[in-house]
Amino acid sequence: MKFQILSVAALASLASAVSDALDKRDSPLDVSLEVTDNTNVKATIKNTGTEDLKLFKTGTFLDDSHVEKVEVFRSGKQPEQVAFEGLRLRVSTANLDESAFKILKAGETIEAAFDIAVAHDLSVGGDFDLLTEGAFAYANLDSTSIAGAVPFTSNKVTTAVDGAKAGKVRRDWIDLAKRTIVQSDCTGSRGTATRTALSNCASLARTAANAAVNNSAKLNEYFKSTSSSTASSVQTVYNRIATQCGSTTSGDSTQYCSDILGACAGGVLAYTSPSTSQMVNCPLFFNQSPLSSQCHAQDQATTILHEMTHLRQVKGTSDYGGYGYQFVRSLSAAQNLNHADTYTLFAQALYAQC
């Protein structure tokens, strides 16, 4: 992990596809996609139910920042998913602000527009398939506490992409991200907090790496398997995390203490750009405790660990649109192996002796 005094200015987006285990049959959300111009997409969402819904926008296609709003596949007999090149988040599960929500009244329809070429390399051109599926977390109308989740699945859209135009969109965003200004953002109390979190992260990861091969009950609780291949895979991830968190002068990632890519709204604690190995701690991060002994709590150390799993050099995990212990338990074993909060909560549970 390297600290950086250089800042960038805006890049790409995060992913939030959800667990297949979620039941989508009775959802009141009707979501449809439409391509309006080359790689520009309009998403329409209608509340077909009889009750108003207070939807949590962060990390969804209603988010103003660049997050993974659709899944993109190269068309063919065996569709190949196009790698997502945007931001991955860790979101607070408490003390959320009203601005993070959108009330969708019964019978109401709203739209969101975005360009998929910002965070997907579509420069080869040709036919691509698009769809979005997942779940919106929601709160009761008089609250900002998450009360549950509403699943959704959109239609599939096939579109012909002009590769030259799509490539220019992507290059323009990359060029913007490379425009740097000098700033000493990881200094003072923020620098101290970040260095402490990295040290605690390394300690948590080392303990978790050992438990992966020596604590089958805990491994089964979080990863739903005790096979030697699962244990070895999980141990490898934690060993990589321990290496990344173990140094502030070397490693594959760069740590920032200010919102260099403008994605710290809506309850975001921290975010990562896996394609550039940039990690950002948001203002909310510095309001967390350094390391909590409460079961499944969020703190600075586990937020760092969560974001580390998103790095391609570590695992390249997804969030599947969900956070917390209950969501971890709802996933399949295969999904747990690629889910950031599963690794986070396994390590935290060992420390908190859950």
Swiss-Prot record:
Active site (record annotation): 307
Claim: Zinc is one of the keywords in the record: yes
Glycosylation sites: 214
Propeptide position ranges: 20-182
Entry's EC annotation: 3.4.24.39
Location relative to the cell: Secreted
Signal peptide feature range: 1-19
Molecular function terms from GO: metal ion binding; metalloendopeptidase activity
Record-given protein name: Neutral protease 2 homolog SNOG_02177
